[in-house]
Design a protein with these regions (language model features):
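Conserved phosphate-coupling serine/threonine residues in phosphotransfer and NTP-handling enzymes
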Residues: 92, 195, 275
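SF2 helicase/translocase NTPase motor core
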Residues: 1-47, 69-70, 80-178, 223-235
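PAPS/PAP-binding and catalytic site of the sulfotransferase fold
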Residues: 73, 103-106, 202-213, 282-283
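Inter-lobe coupling linker of SF2 helicases/translocases
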Residues: 128, 134, 138-157, 173-188, ...
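Walker A/P-loop
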Residues: 55-74
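Pre-Walker A (Motif I) flank of P-loop NTPase domains
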Residues: 54-58, 85, 136, 190
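Hydrophobic residues on the short alpha-helix immediately C-terminal to a glycine-rich phosphate/catalytic loop
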Residues: 49, 63, 75-79, 99, ...
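Conserved Walker B
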Residues: 63-64, 164-168, 196-198
Length: 348
């Protein structure tokens, strides 16, 4: 028996009404056919995301390897079952295909990766709102969402999932253009933020992530600094915990060892003596990287690329070989271009 969209939405609403937002029954129907082995902490995290209907979102901050993508998939499946299908996933560009495969293969949720080429094709075809697609989840990169912020802001999203959300932790700084642009574009939308590292260097990063979801939680930046400047006081720390409890959920690896058999790894120390040729390669590359005039590396990226090259050099000769080949090709290309310019100048 097939249901119309209206009937399906009505039945989903009835099921939701009968089940409390923090009950397992709320998710049971939505993930009945999912190809995943669920762990208790994943179900708990998904239910947490539903717990407060007045909340503007949630921050799921489980440690690395505990399945935050699965937790998000549970939330997406329930929203899909409720016919709330205007869903956007913002993720680093290199993770777009991974999200596409996970949602397709494990939760049978249709997805579309939206990038420049299909976006422009949609515009040429007369679809002037490429983000507003029916019955498919839209996946895009941070940069693309930032570039198309006006489209993102004008789309009535039911849910926005933001992966690797620690990229937004400095949103309180005006210099973080991407984070501030996305915050403004998504200010009235329900958001689900995923990150394993909600706090790295400063408590202000936690303020940034929470304010991205709901600015009312901590107030403005100056109020936050004044209230939580001294976490050594038990009372202040307790207040911070209470403020975070309704919006942030975190599970640690040590809390799930009862049902997840993590691989036990042992570090072994081995002595390594480089050969004479390897020593010479190291010295030559180091000398090259110390040059004042280094044409192969862009001036604005020199420090970062030097660090990367030194890591490759410390790894193995095979690791650095590919990078050195690329640098050589880049220099040859510059020389050919320069020769062409000089040839044209002579003719003129």
């Amino acid at each position: 028996m097939e249901f119309t969209d209206y009937q399906a939405k009505y039945f989903a609403w009835e099921l939701t009404k009968r089940s409390p937002s923090d009950s397992l029954e709320k998710l049971a129907g939505a993930v009945a056919n999912a190809q995943v082995d669920l762990n208790p902490h994943q179900v708990d995290a998904a239910l947490f995301a539903f717990r407060s209907p007045l909340s503007r979102g949630a921050l799921l901050a489980d440690e690395v390897g505990l399945g935050k993508t699965i937790e998000a998939g549970l939330v997406l499946s329930q929203r899909w079952a409720e016919r709330k299908r205007r869903i956007l996933i913002i993720t680093p560009a290199n993770l777009r295909k991974q999200w596409y495969q996970e949602l397709n293969e494990k939760f049978f949720l249709p997805c579309t990766i939206l990038e420049t080429k299909p976006y422009n094709a949609a515009i040429r075809a007369g679809q002037f709102k490429p983000f507003e697609v029916d019955d498919t989840i839209v996946i895009c990169s941070y940069q693309f969402a930032r570039n198309k912020a006006a489209d993102v802001a004008n789309t009535p999203w039911d849910l926005v999932v933001i992966d690797e959300a620690h990229r937004l932790r400095n949103v309180y700084k005006p210099t973080n253009v991407i984070a501030n642009t996305l915050k403004q574009a998504l200010k009235d939308r329900h958001k689900l933020l995923l990150t394993a590292t909600p706090l790295q260097n400063s408590l202000l990063e936690l303020f940034g992530l929470v304010s991205f979801i709901d600015e009312r939680t901590f107030g403005d930046l100056s109020s936050f600094k004044e209230q939580f400047a001294n976490l050594n006081q038990a009372r202040v720390f307790g207040i911070l915990q209470e403020r975070l409890r309704p919006i942030c959920h975190r599970t640690l690896r040590r809390q799930v060892t009862a049902y997840i058999p993590f691989t036990r790894r042992h570090a072994l120390l081995e002595e390594f003596t480089p050969e004479e040729s390897e020593d010479r390669l190291y010295d030559l590359v180091s000398e090259y990287l110390r040059r004042d005039n280094l044409q192969a590396l862009p001036a604005g990226q020199r420090s970062l690329m030097t660090l990367v090259l030194r890591k490759l050099l410390a790894s193995s000769t095979f690791a650095i070989a590919g990078a050195l080949t690329s640098i050589a090709e880049r220099l040859k290309k510059k020389l050919r271009k320069q020769a062409l310019v000089e040839s044209l100048e002579e003719e003129l």
